[in-house]
């Protein structure tokens, strides 16, 4: 990073976060994740027996246990096998149409799924580089790895991708060949644009190939490795939670199981997923009934949801469903693979405590000094720790919801239930209060049979029904609002006045439109936002900027200069410059000055660039807001070409270019999959020629353009 990078590319906050870890705005998670991971791993073992006995629990192979062993007071991990089988059977009989749809999906849709879908994920653990990479790049190198070792092309479908992984796992030794710069620190430049004021240099590329080898056992370890991270930007929590990201070797299998679960959940009335915001609210409203003598509404969370879930419980449930559908054995094995892998997962422990002085580092491995996690020492493998029980956050969201839903379909429970992973709301309809309490207790104990624990401190039962909370949406009869939780995030960035104003007003507009804010709240939110907006551009109170404007008798014309805001509820969707001109607040000369492309501070066409805080991955951002002279991005520093992330950045840029040209030439990809014969390049060329030939240009120009397409 050179000296002026902060001035040229990154805002001060980001710079501070890059240079000094552990500082920065509050909800950001910094530093080592080791403690959070160890807590996550030890919890399922502590909760397995009524009296915590980690040493004994470590010998457990599967999480099933007898009903009398279940801790009814505190959280309990594990499940009761017979109950899961019976509940799954019961659920299957009750929702026969949903199961038929699942069978149709397995026979017709599953073989057509493409593995390209996997590139839609976020960060993915790269088993080759042993760190997180963006999903498309991780997928690309995994496919390269498979093709290099199997010496054949891999078909486009997800099933052929999974089959290739199964084949690779059987090889005794696998290798991966890649290319890298042997001396990234030694930068050699060549001049490519000899402009006297600002010459442009390009780095001379050097490449050498390298080979990484895996034995069969090592590859299996990579397949079951989960990279762990702190959950980022969580508001209102003192302790950070961990989330896990698996490698692309297992993502394909997980995707199949999750999509199958989605197919069931879309056709089951009690699920709160996979529907989005407004539909969820409509679902909640339709569940409320007020016609019985006693009604109640129980809303709350499940405590330690991921730690107490067991992969085996999910596997059992799926096996029951698939067996009853009469699916072939290979489908049952396919659905079993991801749960088997998660049964033997290896979690990455992170850095731990590292003492550094100059170039000396001193790492303290687990078990060297006494700690509360000493029971786990026998499970340590290198810098990872194996963990049989429990799950990690962010893995099987839909399957875990399904597991919760099979347990509430009991004849004894009246009323209706909505569940979305660890969040739920249950409406009771009973004759007496005693009956309602009895049902609530039945619900709590039934959920314990599958390994889900209702949190005593976070659940509240309100009778008569009408007040509750689900998915951070609070309702009182019909009123549903959660924008108060969003207000702290409505802060202008301070890099571009036009975009900042448009984004802030957009959030408020959306909240008012969807009924999350009424008009008074909306007006207040607008006032708060305008205040923050002026403060961000030093136009509030007495500052250097306001003094300068006073001394030179400059009248403020726009809100970011200190003028009074012009937007109201009816005009908040309009651009500020256009609105002020329409209202006659800007004269012709001022308007020309603001929108003149030759302004000294008009925005440059270069896309700006920022680093994602979680993993310091560089990313390119484009800005689509209305250009004006107040849209000042200082011209970009060209040293970005020499960053250590250069190779990855180039890959990312090429990837974005290809996807954007495909989006432009094949607009149908937005709705469905575009199919064209030949390679991507040939089909793009053919489509481009077609566009030119059908255009209304004269023949001479058509010929000239067509000759330039190659």
Swiss-Prot record:
Top-level taxon of origin: Viruses
UniProt keyword list: Nucleotide-binding, Nucleotidyltransferase, RNA-directed RNA polymerase, Transferase, Viral RNA replication
GO-annotated biological processes: viral RNA genome replication
Signal peptide region: none
InterPro entries: DNA/RNA_pol_sf (IPR043502), RNA-dir_pol_NSvirus (IPR007099), RNA_pol_PB1_influenza (IPR001407)
Catalytic activity: RNA(n) + a ribonucleoside 5'-triphosphate = RNA(n+1) + diphosphate
Chain coiled-coil ranges: none
GO molecular function: nucleotide binding; RNA binding; RNA-directed RNA polymerase activity
PROSITE patterns assigned to the protein according to its UniProt record, in alphabetical order: RDRP_SSRNA_NEG_SEG
Pfam families attached to this UniProt entry: Flu_PB1 (PF00602)
SUPFAM superfamilies xref list: DNA/RNA polymerases
Residue ranges annotated for the RdRp catalytic domain, each copy included: 285-460
EC id: 2.7.7.48
Its biological purpose: RNA-dependent RNA polymerase which is responsible for replication and transcription of virus RNA segments. The transcription of viral mRNAs occurs by a unique mechanism called cap-snatching. 5' methylated caps of cellular mRNAs are cleaved after 10-13 nucleotides by PA. In turn, these short capped RNAs are used as primers by PB1 for transcription of viral mRNAs. During virus replication, PB1 initiates RNA synthesis and copy vRNA into complementary RNA (cRNA) which in turn serves as a template for the production of more vRNAs.
Quaternary structure, from the entry: RNA polymerase is composed of three subunits: PA, PB1 and PB2.
Family membership: Belongs to the influenza viruses polymerase PB1 family.
Stated name of the protein: RNA-directed RNA polymerase catalytic subunit
Organism: Thogoto virus (isolate SiAr 126) (Tho)
